[in-house]
């Protein structure tokens, strides 16, 4: 008896969806491409937004920025919901492990009263700044154009909400979960002179209607100052005060802000390279935002660190902006 085994190849009729093929050609698409590109509705809207009847749903004119292709703002991390959740779950697992270790070893008892007081007064109120950052990025998700940008903005909004929650957890770790530290931090936020510039910045920024101006303000300038002043210089002060154990509780914040920078830098650089109009507009926004944020952080930096700390943070932000094709205007 002879047994013959025949094989045949099955060729798919289509490699991908039609909307993906129009952009990328007839080839297999990644999951990020399938859920991110050209999926936002553009026509046949049944009504205008009741809150802004002069606009349409998914309107490109919510920002003065102009793009030939709004899907040019692709995420280098290629985050869609599944990959984003998996990545952040790993960061959260590490953070939870760090907090559990801190509490199990009762490391808060080794901190001096001076350090605890300064952390409560100078670090914990940043949870309000992060809540504002959450709203800033919500604006990008609500009014932005193109799913590649809007989905990444909502992820960033959730990141800032997570940072705010972990800052609150630091307070609870210091006061034995009584919540007293959070009440003290709230009073500092509402009344201490060092915080009033940042309070004003947060409140006034929420009236801004251009979502991309908020994007630049938050991701380049505010996050730049926070990273340099809070998670570098203030962290170094903690080390000098034998409070290096607190550094493990801010690891989530540093890792998350570093990851957000990979994405936001790409978006800003792409926008600046699009046209001279965009570059001029972004430079004007950057110049305005840099002055506002520096003025807002100066009282805090003077109280928490040194007089020249805010100048170092400003220089770090300017150097970062130069790599993106931006610089402050000298005549502004």
From Swiss-Prot:
Oxidoreductase among keywords: yes
Signal peptide positions (record): none
Pathway annotation: Aromatic compound metabolism; phenol degradation
Keyword Oxidoreductase on entry: yes
Coiled coil: none
Record keywords, A-Z: Aromatic hydrocarbons catabolism, Monooxygenase, NAD, Oxidoreductase
Primary enzyme class: oxidoreductase
GO molecular function, one term: phenol 2-monooxygenase activity
Induction conditions: By phenol.
Stored Pfam families: Phenol_Hydrox
UniProt-listed InterPro entries: Ferritin-like_SF, MP_mOase_hydro, Phenol_Hydrox, RNR-like
GO biological process: aerobic phenol-containing compound catabolic process
CDD domains: AAMH_B (cd01058)
Catalysed reaction equations from the record: phenol + NADH + O2 + H(+) = catechol + NAD(+) + H2O
EC number assigned by the record: 1.14.13.244
Sequence similarity: Belongs to the TmoE/XamoE family.
Free-text function comment from the UniProt entry: Part of a multicomponent enzyme which catalyzes the degradation of phenol and some of its methylated derivatives.
Name of the featured protein: Phenol 2-monooxygenase, oxygenase component MhpL
